[in-house]
């Protein structure tokens, strides 16, 4: 974009995994960024490190979206906000099955509060962090944006679907609104500096942090859930995408959310599926170690394969994933060895 004066972006959940990498990319592209986060999934340390990497000072507020007055205070303090990128959410699929009401309260009601605050302050443009889980079990592969949605297998996925529906309804009744929904597949990796990465609280929800924790000795073995799927090696296949490609997808979506109105949806994926064993092999190559794993029974709810059709984002946003699985594993290992305790110091105490 040729704009001299960049927009000011409010990023909710900007201290989290995807949020922090997107904040870096926004700042590098010349945008002004304001972050709100309640630090349930993210760490204040990630904001400090973003400031170190980018040389920027980031206004950051400890705000829970369930407290609408706190959101309104941020909009009042920063009347220059013109676009919102909304990451803030609870994100553990397994936990959502155990605590569905918590996920609906935080992910859905929190978003309603945010939308109402936007309406009260005349902000009408938002990019929403959604998920490929809204597609449920694949009816066909690769999955494009016309694949049926709503047949979700977890309250987490339902909460993302519900928010998509709410945003669609807003666009229907408010013609000036512009919404871009980005459905991510499986984000992996870390910033090339090794200063920012995924820091799961407790037991990781995703495969790759588990693999890296086994490699560095924090865990003794990786459990592989099933090797009898109808895939090339019997293990589950997913579309893994580098976190930096995901972040760049938000930059690509910026012109669309600025220059048009209405409700638009895009997949962010590579279009290439990798199995659990493929990931293990690539990570062994990155770290130079053997990964100790053990095959156990399938998990309830897991599907054999998921893979994106990313052509719409390529055509309409000019965005395409550029990193491969080896790149993802290399950058993840770089983050892991530099930060064996995540954002905590070596004594395990928080800053």
Predicted feature residues:
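Short, flexible active-site loop motifs that bind/organize anionic cofactors or intermediates
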Residues: 13, 61, 86, 93, ...
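Short-chain dehydrogenase/reductase
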Residues: 104, 153-161, 197, 201-205, ...
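Glycine-rich, flexible loop/turn motifs
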Residues: 46, 93, 137-139, 143-145, ...
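Hydrophobic, Gly/Ser/Ala-rich alpha-helical and linker tracts in large acyl-processing enzymes
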Residues: 191-204, 211-214, 220
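Short capping/connector residues at structural and topological boundaries
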Residues: 98, 139-140, 146-148, 161, ...
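N-terminal Rossmann-like NAD(P)+-binding domain of SDR-like oxidoreductases, especially those catalyzing
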Residues: 1-190, 339
